Design a protein with these regions (language model features):
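N-terminal single-pass transmembrane signal-anchor helix
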Residues: 2-33
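Intrinsically disordered, low-complexity regions enriched in Pro/Ser/Thr/Gly and acidic residues
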Residues: 69-235
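Short, Lys/Arg-rich amphipathic alpha-helical interaction segments
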Residues: 6, 36, 58-60
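Alpha-helix exit/C-cap motif
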Residues: 49-68
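Aliphatic-rich helix starts adjacent to a transmembrane/signal segment
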Residues: 25-48, 52
């Protein structure tokens, strides 16, 4: 007659199962989250593209988005964000829209410090390295009804955190970017201004990353994570 398992054998087996689960479960959870974040980014990309088109076709409010920097187009930043039905804003859009065109945010204080992009060191690239944003753009941030957050960043980039202040706050997972080229309606990921510049977060020099049509896939898989933005939309 065969003997059953001893208590020690059962405990050892359960211990092994626990170790394996502890090693694999986080990866499974992350993969599931990443699929959700990817779908959320695609949704936000579509909503943002539609909002820009609506601003262009909204009665007499047809913007001339030819400046190289969102800071010089705060009026249109507010108009675009209004189409997204933002809940909170880091700039006082009610005042800015009354003034018309775009007040110079470098000279006049129209900021609302209750809403900002992530603080320095509280968001990360895909390698786990803390990130920083040029402080001049921290307030160019809007919280949306679905708890996502957008930031009109350096030059003509727009950063999107699909779940707002919730973790992981990591580029290529829940943080992405798009670009609106000068004088154009369609979002893309390459043409950031009127002269060649292929870097994301380029106003924060040591944190700027070159993303091109030839390196974005490798960056998504092995680099900082900004390359995941075009990879998820274009591939």
């Amino acid at each position: 007659m065969k003997k059953g398992f001893t208590l020690s054998e059962v405990l050892i087996t359960l211990g092994i199962i626990g170790v394996v689960a502890a090693m694999t479960l986080p990866a499974v959870i992350n993969n599931t989250q990443d699929k959700q974040f990817k779908a959320m980014f695609k949704k936000q990309y579509s909503a943002l593209a539609q909002a820009i088109l609506m601003v262009y076709t909204d009665g007499n409010d047809i913007p001339n988005l030819t400046h190289e920097n969102w800071m010089d187009m705060s009026f249109y930043v507010c108009k675009i964000s209004s189409q997204l039905k933002y809940l909170k804003s880091g700039i006082n859009c009610s005042t800015i829209e009354k003034l018309g065109d775009s007040p110079d945010l470098n000279k006049t204080d129209y900021f609302n410090d209750s809403t900002k992009w992530h603080n320095d060191g509280e968001w990360f690239n895909k390698k786990g390295e803390p990130q920083k944003l040029n402080s001049g753009y921290l307030n160019m941030t809007f919280l949306l009804p679905d708890e996502s957050m957008i930031n009109f960043n350096c030059l003509r980039d727009i950063f999107i955190d699909v779940n707002g202040y919730k973790k992981p706050n990591t580029i290529g997972r829940d943080i992405f970017f798009v670009t609106l080229p000068p004088g154009k309606l369609n979002l893309n990921f390459w043409d950031r201004r009127t002269f060649e510049n292929d870097k994301v977060n380029s106003c924060t020099n040591s944190y700027a990353v070159s993303i091109t049509q030839t390196n974005y896939e490798d960056d998504c898989k092995n680099g900082c994570g900004w390359g995941c933005s075009p990879m998820y939309i274009l591939d």
